């Protein structure tokens, strides 16, 4: 068994039971964004979170243990994503990545935006021309040090 087997079991239970990520997140006690990432194998659950997931998805003790192991993050199956929605993010970074980098450096200096001390919020934004997806990414600024 490995983390991908647990992820597949979670997805199957979610579909079978008609669950929504927002409801799963409420039961586990964290944001829908973080819980979704965790259920998809990208975050480490605490024992309490793993037990809550275990109740929701009828997981075994071994499967709950896998949720508590630090995963291999960013483990998409291909270098360039083929899923259209994920590919749009790849495209956004390809087109706007240098702009984002320049503007962050201009505002903060030489450093990076953390993906560890990080939060994300995804909301629906009503628009008469067609609803929009609003994504807010917030990462701590980390300055490179000289030595």
Swiss-Prot record:
EC numbers on record: 4.2.1.104
Positions annotated as active site in the UniProt record: 88, 91, 114
GO biological process: cyanate metabolic process
Keyword line: Lyase
GO MF term list: cyanate hydratase activity; DNA binding
Transmembrane annotation, as ranges: none
One Pfam entry name: CYNS_N
Ranges in coiled-coil conformation: none
Family named by the database record: Belongs to the cyanase family.
Name listed for the protein in its UniProt record: Cyanate hydratase
InterPro entries: Cyanase, Cyanate_lyase_C, Cyanate_lyase_C_sf, CYNS_N, Lambda_DNA-bd_dom_sf
Catalytic activity, reaction form: cyanate + hydrogencarbonate + 3 H(+) = NH4(+) + 2 CO2
Enzyme class: lyase
Annotated gene: cynS
Role noted for this protein: Catalyzes the reaction of cyanate with bicarbonate to produce ammonia and carbon dioxide.
PANTHER family: CYANATE HYDRATASE
Domain of life where this protein originates: Bacteria
